[in-house]
């Protein structure tokens, strides 16, 4: 029996990358996983299939988090499949690598809509569904604590806001024994970092050199930390910012 048997988890942005890794890990450990996706239905189905192939249970739900009312849409989809939630992982996010001189208001607003507004209102409308003793994990970024990539400023700002959300929410939900934490990855090998890691001959080497461990992380490394925080073992950790950058900030 897995540590999450009998529990339901929702992972936003779970059709690929870090989100898929988290969904697969929670599913493998017994959770029934709601695999949220924004547009790529085929990729979401692949995540569901991967969870099921490992002996878990999952279902896909769609909601475009860029627009107003997205959180309500997400929960309407969720309610068709489940009647309560134990673990919420706010993972969905979009980035921007344009320097401040080039980023438009539209792009800025889109990044904040998905990365900040969506998690806030997903939680707001999901509080009555989240069972006592539950877990909330918000996927932040090491860039919230370093100016190593200033062209990612708008993205980093959203993660700073998400960290404040985690901190303050832990006080609000603590009375119900619900923990809330931020998990901050560094450079992880996903399709989002493909250009950075594989776009030049030395991309991977330069990225690995940033880590004290001399490597580039995989989604599984982030998923393992999320699984700990979501488990009974993580019951006394809340309001925290967990560095999963492989020592890139040291």
Which role does the model predict for each range below?
Residues 123, 158, 166:
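Active-site helix of classical SDR
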Residues 174, 179, 237-238:
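Short, small/polar-rich loop/turn modules that mediate ligand/substrate recognition or access, typified
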Residues 8, 15-16:
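Conserved glycine-rich cofactor-binding loop
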Residues 99-100, 107-112, 207:
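Substrate-binding pocket helix/loop in short-chain dehydrogenase/reductase
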Residues 128, 171-172:
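Alpha-helical segment proximal to the catalytic Tyr-Lys
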Residues 227, 238-250:
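Short C-terminal tail/terminal secondary-structure segment
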Residues 175, 182, 187-211:
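A glycine/serine/threonine-rich, flexible loop-to-helix segment
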């Amino acid at each position: 029996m897995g540590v999450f048997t009998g529990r339901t988890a929702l992972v936003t942005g779970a059709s690929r990358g870090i989100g898929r890794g988290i969904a697969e890990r929670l599913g493998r450990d017994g959770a029934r996983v709601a695999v949220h996706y924004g547009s790529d239905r085929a990729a979401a189905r692949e995540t569901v299939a991967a969870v099921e192939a490992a002996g878990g249970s999952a279902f896909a739900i769609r909601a475009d988090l860029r627009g107003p009312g997205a959180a309500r849409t997400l929960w309407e989809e969720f309610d068709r499949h489940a009647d309560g939630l134990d673990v919420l992982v706010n993972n969905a996010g979009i980035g921007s690598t344009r320097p401040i001189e080039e980023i438009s208001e539209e792009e800025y607003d889109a990044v904040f809509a998905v990365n900040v507004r969506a998690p806030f209102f997903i939680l707001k409308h999901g509080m009555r569904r989240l069972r006592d003793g539950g877990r909330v994990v918000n996927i932040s970024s090491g860039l919230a604590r370093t100016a190593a990539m200033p062209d990612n400023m708008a993205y980093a700002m959203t993660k700073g806001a998400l960290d404040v959300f985690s901190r303050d929410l832990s006080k609000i939900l603590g009375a119900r024994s619900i923990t809330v934490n931020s998990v901050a990855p560094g450079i992880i090998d996903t399709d989002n970092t493909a250009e950075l890691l594989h776009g030049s001959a030395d991309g991977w080497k330069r990225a690995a050199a940033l880590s004290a461990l001399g490597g580039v992380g995989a989604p599984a490394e982030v998923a393992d930390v999320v699984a700990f925080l979501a488990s009974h073992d993580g019951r006394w950790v809340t309001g925290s910012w967990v560095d999963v950058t492989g020592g890139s900030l040291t």
